[in-house]
């Protein structure tokens, strides 16, 4: 029977992660590490050797892997769901359908899919720019599995996994930013064509720098998708609050876009700031989320605002690319920018009944300083009431006259 043999191969393949000369020792936990703790081949100076078949103690033994396979098979035949109640964790009765029933499995390049208006949803995990070279890492398992499967399945005939088809930014394969953006766009085009008009695309993405997010957003929007929702999986609150590069995992939900409207960058920036403010207020009031998670959601909402105007955002008479906008969004959400006090003041003038909270939100991620604005009478606080220093404000007029007459620190 092929099934038991392949189940044994699965267990053996998993046990390879911790039973190889590439496995290191985790001193803090007194056990072996698996080889892909860094998503790379990282040969240790002092490999860790365990009992491959299993003892009372140890990590990643064949016995443990085999037990995991059995648990998986049993779950697939009688899947359930667990949920938390006030009395503890509860488990549902088994579902009416087994995992794997009424399923069609295909192997190949997804860009070869020729479906048209067929799918209600596409749930995927796209390549991560230059973050993880899956084709390189998967060879570790492939070469072992091929010994057993090469005569059974045509996909195991080649000596190694495919390289040229991989959508990555990898200099070793003569693939850079342009190739990644083009090929990722090809994939999104295929998904767009295969979805029904009311279909939905959902995928996870992980990276840290604005360039990779810019490439993703550019390819996604070029394929006529609009970001409609984002959900954080993990984030680093310290990096968000300190303005450092942030690594986070995020679930992105997108749908076919409607007609996109032209907009100036200043107007879009105000929309992004306003949306971020509303998002932050809503999440802090109703949910117990970390600031890092809230920051990720704010970032996603900013992506949504941009995707409604992709290819139509103008600054100084030029159309901004998605990568340029993402750089600015990073500045608004977490870093500094060249937006100064006058820019913030002009943004406040656009708001109905601006408040001190609006000032704080608009200043966030800019080089503007609220104290400098206060010293220049661009705003003032009178008995807790926020007042803008407009042309008809007497104190603002007095400040300007003083500067013009040279009695102050005039220019």
Write out the residue ranges for each language-model feature.
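Nucleic-acid modification enzymes, centered on SAM-dependent nucleic-acid methyltransferases
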Residues: 1-118, 133-173, 187, 211-212, ...
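A short glycine-rich, Lys/Arg-flanked "PGG" loop and its adjoining helix->strand segment in the class I
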Residues: 181-197, 218-223
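Short glycine-centered segments of the SAM/dcSAM-binding site in methyltransferase folds
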Residues: 200
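Short, positively charged loop/turn segments that connect secondary-structure elements
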Residues: 349-378
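Short acidic-aromatic active-site loops that bind/stabilize oxyanions
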Residues: 173-181
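Hydrophobic beta-strand segment of the Class I
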Residues: 122-123
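Conserved SAM-binding loop
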Residues: 127
């Amino acid at each position: 029977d092929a099934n038991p043999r392949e189940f044994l191969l699965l267990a053996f393949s998993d046990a390879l992660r911790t039973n190889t000369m590439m496995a290191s020792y985790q001193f803090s936990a007194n056990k072996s590490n698996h080889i892909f703790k860094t998503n790379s081949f990282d040969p240790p100076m002092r490999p860790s050797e365990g009992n491959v078949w299993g003892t009372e103690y140890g990590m990643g033994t064949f016995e443990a892997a085999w037990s995991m396979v059995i648990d998986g098979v049993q779950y697939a035949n009688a899947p359930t769901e667990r949920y938390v109640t006030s009395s503890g964790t509860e488990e549902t009765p088994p579902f009416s359908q087994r995992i794997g029933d009424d399923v069609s499995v295909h192997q190949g390049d997804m860009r070869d899919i020729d479906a048209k208006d067929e799918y209600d949803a596409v749930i995927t995990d796209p390549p991560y720019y230059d973050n993880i070279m899956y084709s390189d890492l998967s060879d570790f398992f492939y070469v072992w599995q091929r010994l057993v499967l090469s005569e059974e399945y045509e996909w195991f005939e080649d000596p190694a996994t495919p390289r040229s088809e991989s959508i990555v930014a990898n200099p070793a394969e003569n693939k850079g930013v342009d190739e990644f953006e083009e090929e990722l766009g090809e994939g999104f085009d295929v998904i767009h064509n295969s979805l029904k008009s009311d279909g939905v695309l959902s995928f996870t993405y992980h990276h840290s720098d604005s360039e990779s997010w810019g490439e993703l957003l550019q390819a996604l929007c070029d394929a006529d998708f609009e970001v409609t929702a984002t959900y954080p999986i993990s984030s680093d609150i310290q990096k968000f609050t300190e303005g450092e590069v942030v690594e986070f995992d995020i679930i992105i939900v997108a749908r076919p876009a409607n007609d996109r409207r032209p907009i100036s960058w200043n107007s879009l920036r105000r929309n992004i700031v306003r949306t971020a403010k509303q998002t932050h207020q809503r999440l802090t009031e109703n949910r117990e989320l970390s600031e890092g998670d809230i920051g990720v959601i704010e970032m996603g909402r900013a992506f949504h605002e941009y995707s409604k105007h992709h290819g139509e955002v103008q600054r100084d008479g030029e159309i901004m690319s998605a990568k340029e906008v993402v750089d600015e969004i990073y500045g608004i959400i977490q870093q500094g920018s060249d937006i100064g006090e006058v820019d913030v003041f002009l943004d406040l003038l656009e708001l109905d009944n601006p408040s001190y909270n609006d000032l704080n939100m608009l200043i966030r991620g800019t080089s503007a300083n609220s104290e400098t604005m206060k010293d220049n009478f661009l705003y003032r606080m009178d008995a807790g009431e926020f007042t803008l220093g407009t042309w008809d404000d007497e104190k603002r007029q007095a400040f300007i006259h003083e500067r013009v007459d040279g009695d102050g620190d005039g220019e």
